[in-house]
Amino acid sequence: MPTIQQLIRTERQTLSRKTKSPALRSCPERRGVCTRVYTSTPKKPNSALRKVARVRLTSGFEVTAYIPGIGHNLQEHSVVLIRGGRVKDLPGVRYHIIRGTLDTAGVKDRRQSRSKYGAKAPKE
C-alpha cells in the first residue's frame, strides 16, 4: 500500500488493456479479400476438419478467420466481412467471417439461429 506522500509524488497508473482482436483496429467489423481457403485440424481432445480462410484486411493485416456453418461458397479473391471472436480449439484463429454479407452466402436450410448464419426465413 503506498503512503499518501508517495501518491502525491506519482499518481496511480491505470492498467492498459490489450485488445484480443488487433487487426480490427477498434472497428466492429472489417472487410477483406480471401487469399487462401482451406481446412485445419483442432487441438488435442477434438477431431474435425474446420473450414478457415486467410484474409487480407483493409487495415493491412493478414489474418486467419473461421467460416461458421455447414457448407460455404468462399474461394480465393472472395470479398468477406470479418468480426472478432476466437475459435477455442484452433490456435491462431481469432476472427469469424460473417455469413450472408458481401460474397459470403448464408447457410442453406437453416431453421434455428438464422440471424447468426445469414439465412432467410423459411417459406411456410
Curated annotation (Swiss-Prot):
Q: Which Gene3D superfamilies match?
A: Nucleic acid-binding proteins (2.40.50.140)
A Gene Ontology term for the protein's cellular component: small ribosomal subunit
Query: Which SUPFAM superfamilies does the record associate with it?
Result: Nucleic acid-binding proteins
Q: Would I find Ribonucleoprotein among this entry's keywords?
A: yes
- Gene Ontology molecular function terms on file: rRNA binding; structural constituent of ribosome; tRNA binding
Pfam family for this entry, one: Ribosom_S12_S23
Question: Where are the membrane-spanning stretches?
Answer: none
UniProt entry tagged with the keyword Transcription regulation? no
- PANTHER family, per this entry? 30S RIBOSOMAL PROTEIN S12 FAMILY MEMBER
Function of this protein?
A: With S4 and S5 plays an important role in translational accuracy.
Name the chain's protein. Small ribosomal subunit protein uS12
Tell me what organism the protein belongs to.
Answer: Synechococcus sp. (strain RCC307)
Gene name of this polypeptide: rpsL
